């Protein structure tokens, strides 16, 4: 069976793991980081994903996309989307009722759906796994927040498809963390576990019971807009005010200054989890003013006091919903980078009367860890006793039901029902001789359907004339393990039936759209690779030219070279260097042609020099042109300098 990976697709950071040899490996990306920013950037020349995208955000804020998870599977008119848009530096537009991100890429305007942006992050995670495993990876388990509704789950699955992944299952993040935890701690009897997940952008609390390898989610609550970024914002505002006080200048209108300040604040926040104070030093932050300051942990805690305290409300709600007293919670698990903050750990511990939360699993990695275990189970990896014994029960995040007379919400599947599940109920007509019924499916907890979210609707027609209340219409809700729902209605007298799969009405991508996006993803991948080889050819030429220049300015070489040869070579090198300065965006072929031209002048001259008994005459001893490719620094080798140390080694520049 091909390997299957687990991906934690986070709002701000993502993480990937694989289950191998009875243990989980969390896989580091090409920058050596075990988590990758969920950022995608578009520039004049290329597309960047992950660290590279986040690192250049200050220079390119309007074309650097993040937080796609806040838009995925939602409608443009969704109040959440409207309020989020106010804070995004990139442009979100309405396209057929869905939010679409508009950026400038390679000089023209391009539009991407949130699914496409997320698919790019997923592709990055997949490639991270592939380069580690040395083979292709197709199967994955991807996690979503517990309160994601049906369309958000579908859209996440679509993002996986566009990334060329076969999504084995979408599972809830707390469930994944619980699996990670369940493998670490096998205990007798039923255990109540509270998962406290405070990430970069969101906050989720879930209560699970674990018994003999069976996980059940009892209840979930949270705040979609609370996380590390909010703590960063408090620091940013604090320092903007300090800058105003000290320098009488307002830097908040300058996007780049704000971005640099935010990066420094994120770093400071992380430091304050282990140190009592830290300093911030940013050169030329705004209008040439250097900003040097410091902040203590106590001040940081005070700035975020209300936010930290507010994390306790969902904890209370989860216990209330699950009808469990806090003294009955056996284990508390901390997940998400923000749970490293000592004050948060203390609040949690105090709430549970001094009980120490469990932090044995790296909080950034716990979700990917569990997803990787689940991926191994679903892909049939039964090599491990530990994966063999897990059974997973997820829950419906919101109640689902239909509208009955007078706009009343009649739930068939209650919130927190274990899924997969199937429920049927019989309804009837509201008027005499009513020829058909409109089945409208809603999700939500409110008593009236107008306050809930319409998932979809369909009609069942051809009901024979009869007095009201006589026809029997059986409505069945069937929710599968991915939380995808089939709703059907059957008129018992005639056997007439109709059904809906709750996908399209909620703005799910059509098959054609997914295929188009898949093709585009391939195209972008090819473009990314072409750009990389173009840069490599440019660096190769640059490295070769500068190496030659260094070589002929070396006094030992100087005295052995013919003056006219040296002049000829110098002119050619200068010509190449000035061409390079003016043609940074040339094609790979043009760079290679320039290199050939330079070599045609340099090689005969350098051969004479070696013929004259110059030192280091061994092929490949590091002199440009010394006996074949071994000695061309960067000739086709992406700027790698082989052999001696005469020329500078050129590294790729961001």
From Swiss-Prot:
Gly residues bias (residue ranges): 612-646
SUPFAM superfamilies, per database record: Actin-like ATPase domain (SSF53067), Heat shock protein 70kD (HSP70), C-terminal subdomain (SSF100934), Heat shock protein 70kD (HSP70), peptide-binding domain (SSF100920)
UniProt superkingdom: Eukaryota
Region (Disordered): 612-654
Entries under PROSITE patterns matching the protein: HSP70_1, HSP70_2, HSP70_3
GO molecular function: ATP binding; ATP-dependent protein folding chaperone
Keyword ATP-binding attributed: yes
Keywords carried by this UniProt record: ATP-binding, Chaperone, Nucleotide-binding, Stress response
Matches recorded under PANTHER family: HEAT SHOCK PROTEIN 70KDA
Family: Belongs to the heat shock protein 70 family.
Protein name listed in UniProt: Heat shock 70 kDa protein 2
Organism: Paracoccidioides lutzii (strain ATCC MYA-826 / Pb01) (Paracoccidioides brasiliensis)
Organism classification: Eukaryota, Fungi, Dikarya, Ascomycota, Pezizomycotina
